[in-house]
UniProtKB/Swiss-Prot annotation:
GO cellular component, as recorded: plasma membrane
Protein name per UniProt: Undecaprenyl-phosphate 4-deoxy-4-formamido-L-arabinose transferase
Keyword Membrane: yes
Gene3D superfamilies the UniProt entry points to: Spore Coat Polysaccharide Biosynthesis Protein SpsA, Chain A
The protein's Enzyme Commission number: 2.4.2.53
MF annotations from Gene Ontology: phosphotransferase activity, for other substituted phosphate groups; undecaprenyl-phosphate 4-deoxy-4-formamido-L-arabinose transferase activity
Gene: arnC
Length: 327
């Protein structure tokens, strides 16, 4: 079995978007959890274009004497996964842990992820126990997880939980990928030799509301589908062929019924023809929408614009020099 050197430094990456209410508690609990590790650590918080006071609070936390906080400030909102990738580009640890800022995944679980990674795993995922989300979110999450498992063939139980640990070589491999639409847990698993999941607690959200609106969830679903595989395009071709065969068979049926019963049956077939027409139009719009998603993402990749723009990085002088040496 492939072995890795002991983890000397842990980097915790946390995307932040309008989380000023939860930041003091997040910083306190995360720092306390990391202090129990008995090894070096840093806490990178990426401000994803917040409109509240989050950026100022992160800057002050990073500038405080003896702070382990690194503040990465983006110029605007790019989305959770792009913000995490921005954090990945500035980590100095050899084990990287991602964590949400809403405290629904307790920072106190960090030592358990580090201990599991020490057993020789490239990726340590988590499965939320007693999940404190709405029925809609739970149902959507189960459907997406099943879709991912069927498509990738990897039986990971909870791809939606961002409390995860990654070895440094996994992070470097992901940073070498240049697609604009990225879903980090899936991308990481494509590079992992050994991956495992552990159960973790899931708490109710104490501060603010979820930053994932219905439209953001829809966009995330499209990211999942299009970044995984081109299978939907093949299914679209199969679906179109089935519709064409059904249309041909139904056309023959209409001819037979007309010959048997005359033009008077079913209002001379007007309603049935409308039903068939709407079925075909609906199928065409589904196909066009799916093709449009793929073409739009190809267009974004061809433009080769950066997936994020870092406006400022605030860190302690000694850690800044180490980060420059690594670069």
């Amino acid at each position: 079995m492939l072995t890795y050197p002991p983890v000397k430094k842990v980097s915790v990456v946390i995307p932040v978007y309008n989380e000023q209410d939860s930041l003091p508690e997040l910083l306190r609990r995360t720092d306390a959890a990391c202090a129990t590790l008995g090894r070096q650590y840093e806490i990178l918080l990426i401000d994803d274009g917040s409109s509240d006071d989050s950026a100022r609070m992160l800057t002050e936390a990073a500038e405080a004497e003896g702070s382990h906080v690194v503040a990465v400030l983006l110029n605007r909102n790019y989305g959770q996964h792009s913000a995490i990738m921005a954090g990945f580009s500035h980590v100095t640890g050899d084990l990287i842990i991602t964590l949400d800022a809403d405290l629904q995944n307790p920072p106190e679980e960090i030592p358990r992820l580090v201990a599991k990674a020490d057993e020789g795993y490239d990726v340590v995922g988590t499965v939320r126990q007693n999940r404190q989300d709405s029925i809609f979110r739970k149902t959507a999450s189960k459907m997406i997880n099943r879709l991912i498992q069927r498509t990738t063939g990897k039986a990971m139980g909870d791809y939606g939980c961002m409390l995860r640990a990654y070895r440094r070589h996994i992070i470097d491999a992901m940073l070498n990928c240049h697609e604009r639409s990225t879903f980090i847990p899936i991308l990481a698993n494509t590079f992992a030799r050994r991956a495992v999941e552990i159960p973790v607690m899931h708490a109710e959200r104490e501060f603010g509301d979820s930053k994932y609106s219905f439209m953001r969830l829809i966009n995330l679903m499209y990211d999942l589908v299009t970044c995984l595989t081109t299978t939907p395009l093949r299914l679209l071709s199969i679906f179109g062929s089935v519709i064409a065969l059904l249309g041909f068979a139904f056309g023959l049926l209409l001819v037979v019924l007309r010959l048997a019963f005359g033009p008077q049956w079913a209002a001379e077939g007007v309603f049935m023809l409308f039903a068939v027409l709407f079925m075909f139009i609906g199928a065409q719009f589904v196909g066009m929408g799916l093709l449009g998603e793929y073409i739009g993402r190809i267009y974004n990749d061809v433009r080769a614009r950066p997936r994020y723009f870092i406006q400022r990085v605030v860190r302690q002088p000694e850690t800044a020099s180490k980060e420059e040496d690594r670069s």
